[in-house]
């Protein structure tokens, strides 16, 4: 089973899995929805293959009295499944090959700001799942039985204590909601708000920058190797420093992901005894 990583800094993760048919004749309970999401996560952990896709990122910083900073980056994004040394678990690793920065060839392959988000595909932001019930409070929004095609909406908020925080995927007090497609029981949209988020960690004698983070993720079904997985199609983030700060600053990030493909390893034999190319 893939290792699930804690939700740290700007990380965000994927909710994927096999389509599971909703029960049309019976309104699901909160417990049943959590069970379905746990099954989706387990399917993702064990079945999602290594993939690559087109990534388009717009990163901005807006500060009062200063010109805006804008960076547009186009890359080939890769999500690679790496087995552990003992072959018992796997970890999903993010890689990217930057193709252009602001329309020009890149001078380096390290993505830079002004605003960054990492870890979006790396593991286990299971905010709506059975294994996070000790860390979260869940509320199922009232379901309109006359509109069976409307998404189920689950609201959540963290319940962090000194005893449970170490095992919680959300390490900062946060709240949000997810929208779940009733036909497939897959999450199609995630909203997360963290009122006091560490935007920039402390460095030496410089205090950290604390502020509000608002994060949204949209998911879409993608066929990979004959199986359907719900992958991020759009990720947006809006950070603002605390209102008491002298210079109000906003950090914005928007990434779109298109043209997903399963990674394939091919080998061909070259004439003359040359080594095969992989």
What are these regions (language model features)?
Residues 6-18:
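Bacterial N-terminal signal peptides
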């Amino acid at each position: 089973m893939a290792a699930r990583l804690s939700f740290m800094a700007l990380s965000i993760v994927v909710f994927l899995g096999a389509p599971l048919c909703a029960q049309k004749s019976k309104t699901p309970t909160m417990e049943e929805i959590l069970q379905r999401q746990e099954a989706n996560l387990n399917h993702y952990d064990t079945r999602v293959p290594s993939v690559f896709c087109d990534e388009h990122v717009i990163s901005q910083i807006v500060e009062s009295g200063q010109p805006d900073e804008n960076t547009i980056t186009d890359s080939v994004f890769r999500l690679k499944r790496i087995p552990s040394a003992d072959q018992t678990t796997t970890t999903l690793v993010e890689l990217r090959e930057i193709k252009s920065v602001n329309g020009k060839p890149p001078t380096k392959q390290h993505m830079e700001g002004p605003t960054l988000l990492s870890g979006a595909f790396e593991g286990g932001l299971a905010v709506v799942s059975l294994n996070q019930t000790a860390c979260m409070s869940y509320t199922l929004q009232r379901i309109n039985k006359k509109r069976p095609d409307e998404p189920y909406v689950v609201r959540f908020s963290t319940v962090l204590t000194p005893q449970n925080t170490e095992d919680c995927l959300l390490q900062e007090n946060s709240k949000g909601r997810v929208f779940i497609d009733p036909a497939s029981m897959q999450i199609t949209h995630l909203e997360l708000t963290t009122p006091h988020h560490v935007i920039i960690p402390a460095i030496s004698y410089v205090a950290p920058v604390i502020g509000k983070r608002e994060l949204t993720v949209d998911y879409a079904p993608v066929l990979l190797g004959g199986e359907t997985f719900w992958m991020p199609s759009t990720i947006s983030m809006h950070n603002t420093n605390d209102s008491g700060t002298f210079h109000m600053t906003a950090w914005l990030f928007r990434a779109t992901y298109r043209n997903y493909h399963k990674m394939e390893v091919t080998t061909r034999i070259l004439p003359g005894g040359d080594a095969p190319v992989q």
